[in-house]
Amino acid sequence: ETRPDNPFPGLTTHAYLWTAANALFYSPATDAEFDQLSDLGGVTHHYLSHRDEAGPMLKGIARQFGSTLRAPLAELDDIAEHHRVDVPLGSRHVDSNGVEVIPTPGHTPGSTCYLVPGAEGRYLFTGDTVIRTPDGDWWAGYLDGMSDRHTLAESLRLLATLSPDVVISSAFLGDTAVHRVEPG
């Protein structure tokens, strides 16, 4: 987990390194933790959940680590303004790193979630498609004027079938973006 960034009052973001594949999920706001990422093995693969994670750090990460950028095909133009996308992601599949790529449009047209195996079960990286509120409720990432309500509802129905053990969002309200999911 990288240092927090606060793009809006009350909203916090992090990026997360999955060391099993040296895969970075989301994007850090600064290069302040590049040394720590290097100490953990670096970044070989960089996964974005949607266009809002694209920014100046994409070039910095690629330059520092030689990483492969994987990002939603539906938002390729927006993301490519910051750095070229090496692997456009448009369909549900398990990639060569063991990451299940799950397109979940609705928050944005290209919103994508990722399901990975981990030490404590299955980890679902949801981007901003689903986040936890400070009072413990789940919030669907619907934003007037940007999101598609019906498409997001379909994506949420899909996510409900996955049964992850841990959910990790890119943005969050409250203390943490990492939440263990209790069975039932």
Protein language model annotation of sequence segments:
Residues 1-8, 22-25, 30, 67, ...:
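Metallo-beta-lactamase
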Residues 20-21, 96:
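Residue-level signal for tight coil/turn positions that link beta-strands
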Residues 6-10, 29-97:
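Active-site HxH/HxHxD metal-binding segment of metal-dependent hydrolases
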Residues 14-17:
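Short, surface-exposed beta-strand/loop micro-motifs that present aromatic residues
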